[in-house]
């Protein structure tokens, strides 16, 4: 079965049920544009100059093949728009889902009371799986269409666009929210939940696994037998397993203490209090600390999978925080006294 | 060893024991990684690492350079708030190089403004070997040597070889702890593009009007290691 057919079937089955108002890749339409382009190319190769000119006048829809302006306009602007919409939709939906799973403050008590009457856990797992399918299907669709673009045009524009997507932080399979969703999936799997809930007939998503015992802790997502994505759970600063992880807006993960140290702020002030000129230690992008996200599910996963390590790190961070706050208030007192 | 420079420990700021513990753990991991998979031409020093905050590393002079056959011991000092402040690396012997000063320091911007906590000692040593091979002439520490490198390359090469022979020819045996998993030894084939050989080939292919003592630098032919340096410098 071709991917186009699988994707269409997926859209028919799932888009209406769970992902209303969510954007998706217009795979069929973009494929048609490429088909027109291919026809245009063959026309240009076959016809002499005069005929070709006439052909162009008759059908302005067919792209001028050397520059491929139509393709470029249709493709890359459309794909950028779609990818950013999908990324935005995915992140907001995941955020909403995870806020329900790990509520904080007053919501926690409401949630506990609610759980006495209704068991929402299964619905949440189902929605999590739907979101995973949504993001993987769309990511594969983008990947396939870019491959096709490169094949037809004999160019590397598709590959360049892929790397541009990464720099613009709209690469779907590199999103920290996907890691969060994977952690949520693993956290739910560890509790006793009916595994048959929410599986799709044409499910691409097969397996999410996490190994924290190895020298390099990894989370692996296997979309199919051939496609595997590995996400490192090592902090690039302390070179240890992430503890109390935060994702900066560039997508890089750090421990809270490490991120605060890199941004030269106290731990108790938090990652978001970093100055705007503070740069990501890995990619050196600036202004990435302001929209940092606390990875609660990933933290929960690490907490449950390696308890001793988590406790040890918690003790260390608390000691450091106490020391830092003492230092801070001492300096404030001295400042107020004019010393 | 030849004529060694005094390696005084840089003053350490007062830091909390927790911060020092974090630094010690990170340095321990880096040390293990260094034993496991050292950068090309680098290996551990002769004495065992007793203090995590002070290492000794040996850089073997890369082949096809004036430093070939030389053994360069390097002192590595880590601050107590590492990795939030950069380590200090000093060559313990005299090195005739445009980017190395009289105190054995290599002035690179990744040790000052462009330092990032995500950089590891392996990456820094890779930079060291890279610069040793392919000097950064846009910001030299020693202008006289840089000028000589640009305009009288053969004289520079001769002097650098003589200094290497004089100061850095004593062989050093690396010390590996008994429990360390030692990685593969650096290959004999140079990892870096042979700058000197490339320059000589360019000179021979050029017209006879260019004198051999004034070989122009091939600025267009940017090596992969220069690109690596650019990446590290952001």
Swiss-Prot record, chain A:
A biological process from GO: protein ubiquitination
Highest taxon listed in the record's lineage: Eukaryota
Top EC class for this record: transferase
Pathway recorded for this protein: Protein modification; protein ubiquitination
Catalytic activity, reaction form: S-ubiquitinyl-[E2 ubiquitin-conjugating enzyme]-L-cysteine + [acceptor protein]-L-lysine = [E2 ubiquitin-conjugating enzyme]-L-cysteine + N(6)-ubiquitinyl-[acceptor protein]-L-lysine
InterPro entries per record: BAH1, SPX_dom, Znf-RING_euk, Znf_RING, Znf_RING/FYVE/PHD, Znf_RING_CS
Molecular functions per Gene Ontology: transferase activity; zinc ion binding
Keyword Transferase carried by entry: yes
Domain annotation SPX: ranges: 1-163
Keyword Zinc assigned: yes
Alphabetical UniProt keywords: Metal-binding, Transferase, Ubl conjugation pathway, Zinc, Zinc-finger
Domain notes from UniProt: The RING-type zinc finger domain mediates binding to an E2 ubiquitin-conjugating enzyme.
The protein's name in its UniProt record: Probable E3 ubiquitin-protein ligase BAH1-like 1
Organism name: Oryza sativa subsp. indica
């Amino acid at each position: 079965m071709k991917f186009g057919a699988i994707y269409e079937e997926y859209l028919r089955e799932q888009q209406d049920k769970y992902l209303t108002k969510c954007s998706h890749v217009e795979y069929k339409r973009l494929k048609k544009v490429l088909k027109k382009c291919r026809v245009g190319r063959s026309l240009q190769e076959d016809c002499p100059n005069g005929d070709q000119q006439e052909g162009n006048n008759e059908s302005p829809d067919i792209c001028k093949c050397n520059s491929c302006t139509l393709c470029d306009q249709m493709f890359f602007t459309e794909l950028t728009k779609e990818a950013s919409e999908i990324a935005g939709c995915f992140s907001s939906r995941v955020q909403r889902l995870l806020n329900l799973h790990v509520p904080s403050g007053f919501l926690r008590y409401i949630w506990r009371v609610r759980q006495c009457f209704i068991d929402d856990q299964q619905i949440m797992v189902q929605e999590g799986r739907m979101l995973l399918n949504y993001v993987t299907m769309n990511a594969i669709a983008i990947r396939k269409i870019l491959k096709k673009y490169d094949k037809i045009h004999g160019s590397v524009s598709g590959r360049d666009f892929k790397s541009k997507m990464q720099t613009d932080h709209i690469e779907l399979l590199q999103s920290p929210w996907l890691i969060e969703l994977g952690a949520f999936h693993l956290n739910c799997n560890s509790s006793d939940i009916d595994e048959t809930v929410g599986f799709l007939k044409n499910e691409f998503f097969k397996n999410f696994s996490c190994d924290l015992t190895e020298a390099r802790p990894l989370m692996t997502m296997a979309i199919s037998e051939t496609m595997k994505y590995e996400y490192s759970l090592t902090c690039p600063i302390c070179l240890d397993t992430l503890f109390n992880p935060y994702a900066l807006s560039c997508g890089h993960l750090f421990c809270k203490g490490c991120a605060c140290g890199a941004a030269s702020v106290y731990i108790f002030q938090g990652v978001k209090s970093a100055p705007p000129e503070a740069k990501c230690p890995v990619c050196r992008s600036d202004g990435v600390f302001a929209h940092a996200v606390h990875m609660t599910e990933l933290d929960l996963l690490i907490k449950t999978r390696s308890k001793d390590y988590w406790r040890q790190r918690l003790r260390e961070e608390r000691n450091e925080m106490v020391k830092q706050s003492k230092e801070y208030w001492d300096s404030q007192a001295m400042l107020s006294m004019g010393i | 060893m030849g004529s060694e420079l005094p390696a005084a420990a840089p003053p350490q700021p007062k830091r909390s024991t927790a911060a020092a513990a974090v630094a010690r753990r990170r340095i321990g991991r880096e040390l293990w990684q260094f034993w496991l998979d050292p950068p090309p031409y680098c290996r551990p020093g002769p004495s065992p690492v007793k203090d995590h905050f002070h290492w000794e590393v040996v850089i073997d002079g890369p082949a096809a350079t004036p430093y070939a056959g030389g053994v360069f011991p390097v002192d590595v000092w880590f601050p107590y708030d590492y990795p939030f402040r950069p380590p200090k690396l000093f060559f313990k012997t005299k090195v005739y190089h445009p980017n190395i000063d009289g105190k054995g320091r290599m002035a690179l911007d990744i040790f000052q403004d462009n330092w990032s906590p995500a950089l590891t000692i392996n990456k820094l040593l890779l930079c060291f070997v890279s610069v040793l091979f392919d000097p950064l002439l846009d910001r030299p520490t020693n202008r006289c040597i840089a000028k000589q490198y640009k305009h009288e390359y053969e004289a520079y090469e001769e002097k650098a070889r003589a200094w290497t022979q004089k100061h850095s020819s004593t062989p050093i045996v690396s010390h590996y702890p008994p429990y360390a998993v030692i990685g593969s030894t650096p290959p004999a084939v140079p990892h870096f593009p042979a700058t000197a050989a490339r320059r000589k080939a360019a000179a021979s292919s050029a017209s006879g009007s260019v004198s051999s003592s004034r070989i122009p630098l091939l600025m267009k032919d940017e090596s992969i290691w220069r690109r690596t340096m650019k990446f590290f410098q952001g």
